[in-house]
UniProtKB/Swiss-Prot annotation:
Region (Transactivation domain (TAM)): 221-306
Residue segments, region Disordered: 1-60, 154-191, 205-268, 350-369, 433-461
Function of the molecule: Transcription factor that plays a central role in developing and mature glia. Specifically activates expression of myelin genes, during oligodendrocyte (OL) maturation, thereby playing a central role in oligodendrocyte maturation and CNS myelination.
Listed name of the protein: Transcription factor SOX-10
DNA-binding residue intervals: 98-166
Polar residues bias: start-end ranges: 30-42, 441-461
GO biological process, one term: central nervous system myelination
Keyword annotations: Cytoplasm, DNA-binding, Nucleus, Transcription, Transcription regulation
Gly residues bias spans: 181-191
């Protein structure tokens, strides 16, 4: 009875044998255990012998002090509190896994592998498998027939033994994980791109509709895809244009070839409100260089009332839209003294409002871009060279001196562009049509117009 009790303790306790091994891990312990094993059953003998071998191997690895410390820590531990692992698929020992019946190749490979492994014990298993596959492909039907018949016999026997068997392949976890990671990565990239586009769109919308009284939000919706005002964008437009502007144009339902750039009203925008991303995308310019030409904390002169663009014919060159666009209001080919002559240019300017983040080469067919010249006040000869193809039938320039309301003084230039300041309705003058005082220079899309501007100070008459 004492021997059986000792054996049960050795089986149940994971450290039961370590107390004996701590002090004497020599052959004496093996002789003691052999006396116990002689009186035990065959099943218990194999199990205890395995535990004995494992414990002896562990004893050889660690010194006596380490084994004593481990035994002291684990002596009072209750192993019944350790949770048993639960299989996810629900299979347990009462329901063992049923293997698939072997096909003809597996019958051949199993028999040939055993024979070749006995003949060539040094042969690697992978090389053996490749050789078996090559040999199977070289066999003819007569050679394969015995293996096919054996596989059919095994299949029928398997069907009798397991009538309810249904093949359920195990899903590969790594393939599923990689697929999920790929989907998550795609979603992450799409979400990042969408967030960037949404950020730029919000920035454009904030500039485009700063208030209900702004010229563009006063009862005039954005252009639909069918409305195309103004000249189309030439094919030489640089590729440095903001991609967010392209996305906005597509979302608004109008192609890029019609408008070219999203509408932004700078009439009520302070320089502090311009997002840093838009400013930093102008690669050709130095952002810090702009600040010395801008007024400190100004707000643009706000036009009092815009009833409609038919009534908005009163918009002169100093109106908010014409000044924000910086061009189309000068392109009128009509000769007239009344302000109604500027109706179509102002409507054109609505379609051709430039973004501040647009590239310096984003010019149109009628004249080159004025991105950098727009930040300074220029005398009339330089103005004539910068806008070569403009006929000026509506403006009065006495003695090459710009009129006061057209180039307002720097103290009044509180908008974003000091050269083309935004004027209220009370500041809009009537321009008489005279001949062009400055010789017209042939139009050129070369970058010389914005790389070397001439900065001059204008005096108000």
């Amino acid at each position: 009875m004492a021997d059986d009790q000792d054996l049960s303790e050795v089986e149940m306790s994971p450290v039961g044998s370590e107390d004996h091994h701590c002090l004497s891990p020599g052959p004496s312990m093996a002789s003691d255990n052999s006396s116990h094993l002689a009186s035990s059953g065959n099943g218990e003998m194999g199990k205890v012998k395995k535990e004995q071998q494992d414990s002896e191997a562990d004893d050889d690895k660690f010194p006596v002090c380490i084994r004593e410390a481990v035994s002291q820590v684990l002596s009072g531990y209750d192993w019944t509190l350790v949770p048993m692992p639960v299989r996810v698929n629900g299979s347990n020992k009462s329901k063992p896994h049923v293997k698939r019946p072997m096909n003809a190749f597996m019958v051949w490979a199993q028999a040939a592998r055993r024979k070749l492994a006995d003949q060539y014990p040094h042969l690697h298993n992978a090389e053996l498998s490749k050789t078996l596959g090559k040999l199977w492909r070289l066999l003819n039907e007569s050679d394969k027939r015995p293996f096919i018949e054996e596989a059919e016999r095994l299949r029928m026997q398997h069907k009798k033994d397991h009538p309810d068997y249904k093949y359920q392949p195990r899903r590969r976890k790594n393939g599923k994980a990689t697929q999920g990671e790929g989907e998550g990565q795609v979603e992450g990239e799409a979400g990042g791109a969408a967030s960037i586009q949404a950020h730029y769109k919000n920035a454009h919308l904030d500039h485009r509709h700063p208030g209900e009284g702004s010229p563009m939000s006063d009862g005039h919706p954005e252009h639909s895809s069918g409305q195309s005002h103004g000249p189309p964008t030439p094919p030489t437009t640089p590729k440095t244009e903001l991609q967010a502007g392209k996305a906005d144009s597509k979302r608004e339902g109008r192609s890029l070839g019609e408008g070219g750039k999203p509408h932004i009203d700078f009439g009520n925008v302070d320089i502090g409100e311009i997002s840093h991303e838009v400013m930093s995308n102008m690669e050709t310019f130095d952002v810090n260089e702009f600040d010395q030409y801008l007024p400190p904390n100004g707000h643009a002169g706000h036009p009092g009332h815009v009833g409609g663009y038919a009534a908005a014919a009163g918009y002169g060159l100093g109106s908010a839209l014409a000044a924000a666009s910086g061009h189309s209001a000068w392109i009128s080919k009509q000769h007239g003294v009344s302000l109604s002559a500027t109706t179509s240019p102002v409507v054109d300017s609505k379609a051709q409002v430039k973004t501040e983040g647009s590239a310096p080469g984003g010019h149109y067919t009628d004249q080159p871009s004025t991105s950098q010249i727009a930040y300074t006040s220029l005398s009339l000869p330089h103005y004539g060279s910068a806008f070569p193809s403009i006929s000026r039938p509506q403006f009065d320039y006495p003695d090459h001196q710009p009129s006061g309301p057209y180039y307002s003084h720097s103290s009044q230039a509180s908008g974003l562009y000091s050269a083309f300041s935004y004027m209220g309705p009370s500041q809009r003058p009537l321009y008489t049509a005279i001949s062009d005082p400055a010789p017209s220079v042939p139009q050129s899309h070369s970058p010389t117009h914005w790389e070397q501007p001439v900065y001059t100070t204008l005096s108000r008459p």
